[in-house]
Amino acid sequence: AHYDSTSLSQGAYDNMSGSVGLLGIAEHFARIPHRYGLRFIWCGSEERGLLGAKAYCRDHEEDLKKIVLNINLDMIGCIMGKFIACVTAEEKLCNYLNYLGLEKGFSVSVSQDVYSSDSTPFADKGVPAVSFARIAPPNTGTIHNSYDTVALMSGEQMVKDIDFICAFADRMANAVRCPIAREMPDNMKEKLDIYLNRKRDKK
């Protein structure tokens, strides 16, 4: 999650919500055992081009080889909108999240794509990644400006969003073997190249 915002914004939705959500998940795992080591990372300068996440990946290349999954929170817990999971990894993870949503009775819209957030530098280094957000067209008009205040947020919705992310993280952190392949599929490599301006989109 990134903790920075823009100069005109209070940044409650983008991205105090993700920063607080990550803290809640850290508190959750502080109380329960888990098989895998967990690293909680708050990044700066996301709004200036993912600079914090890029710097972390640059400075921790050896550590990245041990990371099996990146979970990113960027804009959750708002009053309205649909909850999304953007998977930059193999398509099987999309299926996993869809089934988990059904199991938990939680509505989640899952896609395989590149998300414009801190998960992308990790994915570009080969780390499977998923970004969680709650978005709606009206909400996107309230970020990066003075309308991004706590008035957009819902404590009840925040708890529901974090509960689902915790349920997913629990399964990953306590898996006997991580079910997600530690490789980036070719279609995601191409999308990363396009997003990072290394290749032109043919469409």
Please report, for each region that a protein language model flagged, where it lies by residue.
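Short, histidine-centered active-site or binding-site loop motifs used for metal coordination
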Residues: A1-S5, M75-G77, Y147
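Soluble non-cytosolic domains of exported or imported proteins
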Residues: A12, M16-V20, E47-L51, T88-E91, ...
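Metal-dependent peptidase/peptidase-like ectodomains
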Residues: S7, P33-H34, C43-T142
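His/Asp/Glu-rich mid-to-C-terminal helical/loop segments that flank catalytic regions of hydrolases
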Residues: V20, E27, R31, N139-K203
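Composition- and surface-driven signal marking solvent-exposed, interaction-prone regions
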Residues: A12-N15, A55, H144-S146, M184
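Alpha-helical metal-binding/catalytic segments enriched in His/Glu/Asp
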Residues: A1-L50, I165
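Stable alpha-helical elements in mature extracytoplasmic
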Residues: G18-G21, I25, G52-A53, L93-Y96, ...
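Acidic/histidine-enriched alpha-helical segments
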Residues: R35-S45, N72-L73, C178-E190
